[in-house]
Amino acid sequence: MYLLIVFLPLLGSSVAGFFGRFLGSEGSAIMTTTCVSFSSILSLIAFYEVALGASACYLRIAPWISSEMFDASWGFLFDSLTVVMLIVVTFISSLVHLYSISYMSEDPHSPRFMCYLSIFTFFMLMLVTGDNFLQLFLGWEGVGLASYLLIHFWFTRLQADKAAIKAMLVNRVGDFGLALGILGCFTLFQTVDFSTIFACASVPRNSWIFCNMRLNAISLICILLFIGAVGKSAQIGLHTWLPDAMEGPTPVSALIHAATMVTAGVFMIARCSPLFEYSPTALIVITFAGAMTSFLAATTGILQNDLKRVIAYSTCSQLGYMIFACGISNYSVSVFHLMNHAFFKALLFLSAGSVIHAMSDEQDMRKMGGLASSFPLTYAMMLIGSLSLIGFPFLTGFYSKDVILELAYTKYTISGNFAFWLGSISVLFTSYYSFRLLFLTFLVPTNSFGRDISRCHDAPIPMAIPSILLALGSLFVGYLAKDMMIGLGWNFWANSLLVLPKNEILAESEFAAPTIIKLIPILFSTLGAFVAYNVNLVADQFQRAFQTSTFCNRLYSFFNKRWFFDQVLNDFLVRSFLRFGYEVSFEALDKGAIEILGPYGISYTFRRLAERISQLQSGFVYHYAFAMLLGLTLFVTFFCMWDSLSSWVDNRLSFILIVSSFYTKSSQE
């Protein structure tokens, strides 16, 4: 049963990929959706056995790589953390597959699309079930490849090509850090197996000298692993690929942002909690990075006009919450928020897809408006998703997002307070852009043509069913799972997560946090909704004043252009590397020094040497006798004096002297 959970999506992908032309669009869609749905049902059974029954399962399949001290096997680990991720991945993926049947029905390449979706799901399942770093890395690279294929699905679009290449290249930076971290683990522990590494993590280790600095070995490994999470989970610095990934079909965006790809970094940190717990330095870095990401993405999303990009930046901001929750050693709350976020984020994307599908692929919110009457079901679904996103009381997002902020406050450290206040301010901006999206899309007077609005229709049944199921999850999952996953006195996570006693603050945040601290997120959410209502629905004078102010125009450009991150990266990093590659690597080295010292220089040297030797053939015997006498004299001299000369004369210097003499003579000529 456990193996079927992982390999059923691979089976569906293989059938759709190899036999899609025979099955057709409908047959491929039914095959892949059925396989992923069965995998989802089996995941529920595994959740009951492993998490609720406290019976972790380990499967060793076969040896993979065995070379001296290096031993990696195909193995699968099913513990509480794994089965929670299995439910998230398979349930969201099955709903996205069902949604795609109708959404992609008119696309001639639908079998290829369904094949890519299933292979994406398979690689994510490989990532979360692997029992060693090598298998995790295989799934890690697999989801990167699948995301490239899905973003690049409409390959005739130039922007889709650029977005796919950007996602691949930016993620390569993080993947390089992850690979170095895995190599560091093997160097330190002589294995890549999770159980062995985590068992030895508490043993004191010597420091390493890295870049002339003495670093703690565990801290260096954890920071390198975190660099991998920065790339995959779109943290500050490597986050620029995530909004551009919206160029793919909307079901792809839902799957990437809700269940796969971006959640891989959070899962990896939670899986490696026994390592990170012994590196306070790495935890501080993670906390600061996550807090800055949540603030950066929230401020960027307030002035975006693309419907899907606004939701994409909300994903980036929520990932910041998950990351800094890991940084304050509350991995269970981070994974709980990951699960809750999957429901309402998939709901938001699928609802946005219904609007875009009906509006003939129009994504600019400024060209919409007045759609609430034409899309009553979609409007209700989008409203539920947005309220859950901002942490409206008693919805799913409320039970995890507010807990993260309370935990950050009760950490009572500089990093904790930094994360709390940036996270709280991010709640304000999150509420603003969530309600701005609702107002501009559904409630303001329409900015579209009347004939376009009259042709619009609400989501068909195959697209509505996944949205309704996700809406139910966005309403009730947080309430139902809170006590089980983060409640006091429940050993739900068992040994899958490790928190040292000195870092355990969950009980303190529950009982010691001041009431005003618990109310701040709700107050900020209300304030953000109030500002969004007045700015986008009521205050026309404010909008005119904003448009005519020079400072406001510059502020608008700053946030709308995403803090100029793309421009800075292009101007100072990408362009510098391109210039170095052409002027230094290509011109100066490849076509310059290397070619002169390499093939061209050697051929020229021997040609000039042959010409010089040929000039010695004068035809006079006494010239030849003199040359032989001179050569014999030099040979005897060097032979007799070799012991004294060899200590300060290198043979290579003699060769360079001979070659340079030819170049000197040729230049004089």
From Swiss-Prot:
Q: Is the keyword Phosphoprotein assigned to this protein? A: no
Give a GO cellular-component term. respiratory chain complex I
NCBIfam families associated with the record: NDH_I_L, PRK06590.1
- Keywords of this entry: Electron transport, Membrane, Mitochondrion, Mitochondrion inner membrane, NAD, Respiratory chain, Translocase, Transmembrane, Transmembrane helix, Transport, Ubiquinone
Extra remark beyond the main annotation: Exons a and b (AtMg00513) and d and e (AtMg00060) are cis-spliced, while trans-splicing reactions are required to link exons b and c (AtMg00665) and c and d.
- Please name the GO terms of the biological process aspect recorded for this protein, alphabetically: ATP synthesis coupled electron transport; electron transport coupled proton transport
EC numbers listed for it are 7.1.1.2
Please give the name of this protein.
Answer: NADH-ubiquinone oxidoreductase chain 5
Task: Show the Pfam families listed in the entry.
Answer: NADH5_C, Proton_antipo_M, Proton_antipo_N
Query: Is Electron transport one of the keywords UniProt gives this record?
Result: yes
Q: InterPro entries, alphabetically?
A: NADH_DH_su5_C (IPR010934), NADHpl_OxRdtase_5_subgr (IPR018393), ND/Mrp_TM (IPR001750), NU5C-like (IPR003945), Proton_antipo_N (IPR001516)
Indicate the family of this protein: Belongs to the complex I subunit 5 family.
Which source organism does the UniProt entry give?
Arabidopsis thaliana
Topology of this chain in the membrane? Multi-pass membrane protein
Subcellular compartments: Mitochondrion inner membrane
At the top level, the lineage of the source is Eukaryota
The major lineage groups are: Eukaryota, Viridiplantae, Streptophyta, Embryophyta, Tracheophyta
Role: Core subunit of the mitochondrial membrane respiratory chain NADH dehydrogenase (Complex I) that is believed to belong to the minimal assembly required for catalysis. Complex I functions in the transfer of electrons from NADH to the respiratory chain. The immediate electron acceptor for the enzyme is believed to be ubiquinone.
